[in-house]
Amino acid sequence: MGLYTFENEFTSEIPPPRLFKAFVLDADNLIPKIAPQAIKHAEILEGNGGPGTIKKITFGEGSQYGYVKHRVDSIDEASYSYAYTLIEGDALTDTIEKISYEAKLVASGSGSTIKSISHYHTKGDIEIKEEHVKAGKEKAHGLFKLIESYLKDHPDAYN
C-alpha cells in the first residue's frame, strides 16, 4: 500500500470560531442549503457526530459521484481542528483504499488561515500525483468560498 500526502493552505476573512461552526459543526445542514448542486444531503448512519461517527454524503445532480461514507476521526472545537476518513463510495476508485483529511483553522489577523492535509492510501504500488487531486482541491476550495460568502452575507449567522 502506498501513502501520498498533499497539503493545502488558504485564508479567509472569517474568524476561526464562526468559520468552524459553519464549515465543520453545521456543514451537514448548511452546504445542502447553499450548494445543493454539490451536496444533496448528509446523514449520520451511526454515532453522535463525534469521533467514530459514520456519515453518508449524497452528492448533488451536477456531481460526477453519487455518494461517499466517511468516519469522523477527531473533532476539537477548542483548537478548531477536524479529521475524517473517506471509507466508502464511488469517489474511492479501484486504486484508492481510503483518503484521510485533516483541517485546522488558525487565527490570522481578523480572519483565519485554513491548513488542510490529505492522505491518499493507495492499493498496491499505485502512485497518486498532485495533478490527480487538483480538481478535488479546486471543488473543495469553491465550496469553502460559498460558505465564506454566505457568512459575509449573513453576519448574524453562526456567532
From Swiss-Prot:
Q: Which InterPro entries match?
A: Bet_v_I/MLP (IPR000916), Bet_v_I_allergen (IPR024949), Plant_def-hormone_signal (IPR050279), START-like_dom_sf (IPR023393)
GO cellular component term of the entry, any: nucleus
On the tree of life, the source organism's domain of life is Eukaryota
What's a single GO BP term from this record?
A: defense response
What the entry lists under PROSITE patterns is as follows: PATHOGENESIS_BETVI
Q: What keywords is this UniProt entry annotated with?
A: Allergen, Pathogenesis-related protein, Plant defense
Q: Name one GO molecular function term.
A: protein phosphatase inhibitor activity
Show the CDD domains listed in the entry.
Bet_v1-like (cd07816)
| Gene3D superfamilies named in the record | 3.30.530.20
* Protein family (similarity comment): Belongs to the BetVI family.
Q: What is this protein called?
A: Major allergen Pyr c 1
Taxon lineage: Eukaryota, Viridiplantae, Streptophyta, Embryophyta, Tracheophyta
